[in-house]
Amino acid sequence: MSWIERIKSNITPTRKASIPEGVWTKCDSCGQVLYRAELERNLEVCPKCDHHMRMSARNRLHSLLDEGSLVELGSELEPKDVLKFRDSKKYKDRLASAQKETGEKDALVVMKGTLHGMPVVAAAFEFAFMGGSMGSVVGARFVRAVEQALEDNCPLVCFSASGGARMQEALMSLMQMAKTSAALAKMQERGLPYISVLTDPTMGGVSASFAMLGDLNIAEPKALIGFAGPRVIEQTVREKLPPGFQRSEFLIEKGAIDMIVRRPEMRLKLASILAKLMNLPAPNPDAPREGVVVPPAPDQESEA
């Protein structure tokens, strides 16, 4: 027996530890490997580079509204394939696949509840549902949110994350742009605040309608916001676009949005703004939502 064989015979292999799927994830921006549970506590914000990852509609609403106050609205509304539309796949099959993947019936979730004790109606897009595209049910649920806000005489907040109108519903999808905008006119007539929060991405027919009609238009950092995508624009105008074009930082420089707010600071910022607009006492900044960790912004100078 050679010396190599003698060494190999004395080596006892260790049993490989199995790590359950979903325990770890990687930041899309900096590549840092992150503990999934910690990332969720940080509201899907990377603690290393402050990259704001996409967040599910329900997690967003649960992180915004007071615990125990949430009541879902419009959950009975379901999409129908009235046009029998088919591209490379039947629309009804796309719907079934998206519903199975996300657990949602459509791309918009609406809830009413309280924010620091203040009544509010909130809506959030589920981007994982067909790219957060707007169809008839999305429009109907948004109008339901407006009607509930009018009934309760309270503010409305909408978190947009959408690729635009849903092509599989053709003109019925485009009609939602006018339908939702007309509903918001009633909020304006009543003098009730509507705050639009633009997250990554907010594009197409959604950005061209209710997403940009807020009394305040707030964006998350580095969110892509626009109508057509940058690649489409470059191919059309045959010019190179400026760095950061259509990102929230670019838009605030041009006056297209009102402010940029980090996600961990969004809840208190919205509560403070709405309390002022509704002539209510300011929320207590020393009473953060239970279970939510508010990570500080990374020190950009130290990273450089």
UniProtKB/Swiss-Prot annotation:
InterPro entries per the record? AcCoA_carboxyl_beta, Acetyl_CoA_COase_Trfase_b_su, ClpP/crotonase-like_dom_sf, COA_CT_N, Znf-ACC
Q: Which residues bind Zn(2+)?
A: C27, C30, C46, C49
**One GO term (biological process):** fatty acid biosynthetic process
UniProt keywords, alphabetically: ATP-binding, Cytoplasm, Fatty acid biosynthesis, Fatty acid metabolism, Lipid biosynthesis, Lipid metabolism, Metal-binding, Nucleotide-binding, Transferase, Zinc, Zinc-finger
Q: Does the keyword Metal-binding apply?
A: yes
Give the location in the cell.
Cytoplasm
The note on the cofactor says: Binds 1 zinc ion per subunit.
State the source organism's domain of life: Bacteria
Q: In which pathway does it act?
A: Lipid metabolism; malonyl-CoA biosynthesis; malonyl-CoA from acetyl-CoA: step 1/1
Annotated GO molecular function terms are: acetyl-CoA carboxylase activity; ATP binding; carboxyl- or carbamoyltransferase activity; zinc ion binding
Documented EC number(s): 2.1.3.15
Annotated C4-type zinc fingers sit at 27-49
| Chain spans, region Disordered | 283-304
A cellular component term from Gene Ontology for this protein is: acetate CoA-transferase complex
Required co-factor(s) are: Zn(2+)
Q: Which Gene3D superfamilies match?
A: 2-enoyl-CoA Hydratase, Chain A, domain 1
Catalysed reactions, as listed in the record: N(6)-carboxybiotinyl-L-lysyl-[protein] + acetyl-CoA = N(6)-biotinyl-L-lysyl-[protein] + malonyl-CoA
Q: Where is the CoA carboxyltransferase N-terminal domain?
A: 23-292
Q: Which PROSITE patterns match?
A: COA_CT_NTER
Task: Tell me the subunit arrangement.
Answer: Acetyl-CoA carboxylase is a heterohexamer composed of biotin carboxyl carrier protein (AccB), biotin carboxylase (AccC) and two subunits each of ACCase subunit alpha (AccA) and ACCase subunit beta (AccD).
- Tell me the function of this protein: Component of the acetyl coenzyme A carboxylase (ACC) complex. Biotin carboxylase (BC) catalyzes the carboxylation of biotin on its carrier protein (BCCP) and then the CO(2) group is transferred by the transcarboxylase to acetyl-CoA to form malonyl-CoA.
Q: Which HAMAP family match?
A: AcetylCoA_CT_beta (MF_01395)
Q: Which family does the record claim for this protein?
A: Belongs to the AccD/PCCB family.
This protein's name: Acetyl-coenzyme A carboxylase carboxyl transferase subunit beta
This chain's source organism reads Salmonella typhimurium (strain LT2 / SGSC1412 / ATCC 700720)
